[in-house]
């Protein structure tokens, strides 16, 4: 286990994974889960005061999925199982050390940097970005 969490936070993680990446499939949802957990364990940049899954998901202006109808409702058994896998420490490239992701417009490449962060890679329609290793040592 990478971080302490409650049953409510397991459900919350499953719901944000669904809301942000349902169209990206199971692997895409797992990668979004990686970003959420990374934000909760990183003690750097704009995540210095983020310590829990709840803090990470509800941090102001971060996850637009919280405004989606997909965020509401009970997560499915599959979605909970995916969230549990992330909580057990399963990481997937390019989200392994990522703190950010976004979906560029259709048929558009990922930017090499996004808010001064380096592109780690792309999965389907999500571009993932890593902080420098010397800045967020908890992630490396």
Regions found by a protein language model. Give the residues of each.
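Bacterial extracytoplasmic/cell-wall-associated proteins, especially those involved in peptidoglycan
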Residues: 2-140
